[in-house]
Amino acid sequence: MNDNIARKMQQTYNITYWGGGYYCANNRGNISVCPNPDVPEATLDLTELVKQVQEEHSHLRLPALFCFPQILQHRLRSINAAFHRARESYGYKGDYFLVYPIKVNQQRRVIESLINAGEPLGLEAGSKAELMAVLAHANMTSSVIVCNGYKDREYIRLALTGEKLGHKVFLVIEKMSEIKMVLEEAERLEVIPRLGVRARLASQGSGKWQASGGEKSKFGLAATQVLQLIDTLRQAGRLDSLQLLHFHLGSQMANIRDIATGVRESARFYVELHKLGVNIQYFDVGGGLGVDYEGTRSQSDCSVNYGLNEYANNVIWAIGDACDENELPHPTVITESGRALTAHHTVLISNVIGVERNEFTAITPPAEDAPRPIASLWETWEEMQTKGNSRSLREWLHDSQLDLHDVHTQYVHGMLSLTERAWAEELYLNICRHIQYDLDPSNRAHRPIIDELQERMSDKFYVNFSLFQSLPDAWGIDQLFPVLPIEGLDKPLDRRAVLLDITCDSDGIIDHYVDGDGVETTMPMPAYDPEYPPMIGFFMVGAYQEILGNMHNLFGDTAAVDVYLDEKGNLTYQLSEEGDTVADMLQYVKLNPAVLLERFRTQVKNAQLDKALQEQFLTEFESGLYGYTYLEEEE
């Protein structure tokens, strides 16, 4: 395979842009990963990786997450470097800290890989459980701890304990009811609290996550409440404790203009708070830094029209400009960019377990006295074989669709046989295929027909995974993730396909796919070879998906492999999660596996079966209880 074909693969699946330098097509027709783009020669073929891990760990079954902690560290360095350049470029005198909100992915490998990257990093918690995890890791980071979310006294005491232990812990006031508890608990612990305030902005982004920002946001104080908070702290003699201003526009901000507008509005809060005597030293712009899941570099919900440098420049310039205009000190800037840190580092890889294809066979003419809709379908087919016919492709399609509808109606009323229905459906597929060949993608009038027929004629690939467990955002909010075969892409991509999971739910289907510089409802695929079914990669699933996944049909967490590649290309990895067993999932819903096994044993004994068959049934049942929840290939 030559470089031209590799470039075509890059373009077909738009890997160059969503891959971010971490993923690319290689000259074997497979997909490779580069955990550290600073060392571009150190790459790893994903197909070979899966085979090697399975050879050395025979119990590893697909689906499995393949995680690359070095990508996390590279993302951290890249974001920090972008803000360093922005501060130098604009003469910004304040510091900068990237804070990781662990809600994005609380896995130990994520937190500790980021902390051990050798870069400044803070941690953010939004619950008591998360705060306990953060405090336990606090001695490993020299930055700040930000405490967001709703708080009770236990949460507040935990945060103040961290401050008492010498950490820089900010309790961000989200509701006015919190400040009374904070002041009371601080007095009991004899500690000066370090406070922040989350201001609710009028500015709001657009897209799937816009509700997390703006005036209707779940969290934050309105302008009048901010003033009340200041009065409360002044009366308590604790106004100097209020040191951090926090706001949040929304997650995955697609448009840089929305970010710039929001930062400028928040900068006015900074100015006004200083006028009121509040010495704000930290400016937390929250989340919003998006990633380009589509690779379209656009304002689409699953894309972004900016890069790291432009984001950093807009944030630093807006804050610095407001400070300079009002002769105020430059505060330390904080961003909570969890998605941008984690999305790229994880790939879900699974196997295709079956394919439903539209097979085209020669059609025999119907009987002379065939029912009208069947005869009409055949007339359309014969017309299409005659060159120079004046009817349009669109007209042929519409006529055949109407005839097929009549066939189905007459079948329901008992007027047509099953054989006649099958014949009509087969002929309709042949008509669609014939029309599809004659359509011109450059003709705008043909484009809707092309899309319609691609969906109708596409192959159905059944993949061994649960959409609800592994890609919950694809189901819940129709988020797009890059999906493609990780092997066999040197073959002609002359088929269109949709991917379906193995749950008993009609929602278990991926609706949108990256296709070139756009998004389609089907994806390009090579012809399916049942002897060598391709493995499918679901990319950029490192943010939120692991923790949001649910247990629909009792499909559990997948296995996970942490992979490291040094500068010389030497590979090391560890199986960090073996994946949930059936017994694990049954216990989640309070079904005791031992009790179930005993009840099954009783049924088998009472069935008066041959003893050898009894033993076989019991062995299979027990083996299944402690086996993988996903489909397993027979040895």
Swiss-Prot record:
Q: Which InterPro entries match?
A: Ala_racemase/Decarboxylase_C (IPR009006), Arg_decarb_HB (IPR040634), Arg_decarbox_C (IPR041128), Arg_decrbxlase (IPR002985), De-COase2_CS (IPR022657), De-COase2_N (IPR022644), De-COase2_pyr-phos_BS (IPR022653), Orn/DAP/Arg_de-COase (IPR000183)
The processes (GO biological process) annotated in the record are: arginine catabolic process; putrescine biosynthetic process from arginine; spermidine biosynthetic process
Report the residues modified as N6-(pyridoxal phosphate)lysine. Answer: 103
What GO annotations for molecular function exist for this entry? arginine decarboxylase activity; metal ion binding
Required co-factor? Mg(2+); pyridoxal 5'-phosphate
Q: Which domain of life does the protein's organism represent?
A: Bacteria
CDD domains from the UniProt entry: PLPDE_III_ADC
Catalytic activity as recorded in UniProt: L-arginine + H(+) = agmatine + CO2
| Record pathway | Amine and polyamine biosynthesis; agmatine biosynthesis; agmatine from L-arginine: step 1/1
Indicate the enzyme's highest-level EC class: lyase
UniProt keywords (A-Z) are: Decarboxylase, Lyase, Magnesium, Metal-binding, Polyamine biosynthesis, Putrescine biosynthesis, Pyridoxal phosphate, Spermidine biosynthesis
Q: What residues does substrate bind to?
A: 283-293
Query: Which Pfam family is one of those matched by this entry?
Result: Arg_decarb_HB
Q: What is its EC number?
A: 4.1.1.19
The task this protein performs is described as: Catalyzes the biosynthesis of agmatine from arginine.
The entry's family comment says:
Belongs to the Orn/Lys/Arg decarboxylase class-II family. SpeA subfamily.
Protein name, as recorded: Biosynthetic arginine decarboxylase
Originating organism: Proteus mirabilis (strain HI4320)
Q: What is the lineage of its organism?
A: Bacteria, Pseudomonadati, Pseudomonadota, Gammaproteobacteria, Enterobacterales
